[in-house]
Amino acid sequence: MFIKISVKKHSQYISTIKNFLICSIGSFFLRGITAITSILTLYIFTPSEFGLLSIIQQFMLLFPLFLNLGLRQAFWMEYFHKNSIERRKLINRIIIIYLLIALPIITCCLLNKNTLNHIICFGKATAPMITIALFYSFIQFFSELYLQVLRNQMKAFLLTTLQIGAALITIIMNILLVFWMKIGIIGVIIANTCSIFFIACYGFYHYLKCDTHCYITHHKITSHAKYLFILGFPFIPNILFSWILSSGDRWVLAYLTNMENVGIYALSDMAGQLFNMCILYPMSASYIPYMLNKYAQKKEPFYEIERQNRKNMWWTMIIMGILVSIGTIFALFIGPSILPQKYVQSLNYVWIILMGYIFFMGTYFCSCILVFQKKTWNILGMNAIAASTNIILNFLLIPLFGIYGCTIATLFSYILFFYLNLRGAKKAI
């Protein structure tokens, strides 16, 4: 009898764990391949060039989030409150609204490439680099929207297959453009753009194939847009603060020091990006949809669901802390034999960066209940506090401790962000 109860109790986690493992293995494979390519590019790019590439790539990640004005985030929050037919209509409306907003903005940016270059890249990028980065920013919405649908539906295998396919395209294009044709930074940007264009094209094919009833209509589009903007608006500053918390320190480092330090720090943060792809991304594709579905089903009281969620969080953070510490020691031993000498010092900052990501992982658990209850303004406030703290500490600590000051500031800010989310989740029950 006890065995039957135990099996019934834990069987609900089987599909979630399976989806997590599929996404995690796929992400590990993806990041493993791209990491090898990145290490090889270190022998081609100087730290200053690597720093410039890092700045451009961060812009390519950040600008699309502003470009969609919170539409994709609004879609995520609405998805679990609608049935299948309403979800399809929601996708159609969001695509139409996005096109009406994004096309004029992209056109304006293309006409002011030089100004954008001086603001974002301190005038060190070229016009073609900015042009391709803007095209990437426009296309990314469609690829991410499709991947979001797959994550919400917990279709981990298809999601992982697409990721691996995109990674292989990136690798092939990097080999052709960077290592063979030797066109430098712009080759990496083109390779990244080709990979998301592949996902966007497959998403469009699936969109047409799945009887989505695609159409262009203005029927009630204004009222729908208003509702979605109100729902998604807090995500716009929220995205800005999230970016400041995770990546804004690179701009402060570039402003206070030089591109060489940015390149060293960017290489250290690749360990954090690996953690993001192998742990955080699979969580967003498996555990978070699982939790949101569990809240929506209302089969158990919220306090009981949160009690188990909190238990999962603490155990996961402890285990990851141990694994990160062991992995860092291993990296310190083998890193000097793999990396070019000019990049070896980047290994000194890896442990601090990864510990910050572990606390950030904790917020994934805490914020589930806040996301389900659509408490976007609460999340915005917590993000604003943590991001502001990060910037202030960066300006205070970088002049004193250099890159160490940058990593310590980010770690402290992640700890603060975790604490605020944990407190907010307790109040939400």
Show where each model-derived region lies.
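Interhelical loop/hinge segments that connect adjacent transmembrane helices in multipass membrane
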Residues: F2-T16, A125, F157, I185-I189, ...
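Signature of the first transmembrane helix
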Residues: S15-R72, C109-L110, Y136, A167-I171, ...
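Interfacial segments at transmembrane-helix termini and the short loops linking adjacent helices
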Residues: T16, K113-A133, R310, T328-I358
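Membrane-interface junctions at transmembrane-helix termini in multi-pass inner-membrane proteins
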Residues: E78, F138-L162, W351-I385, A425
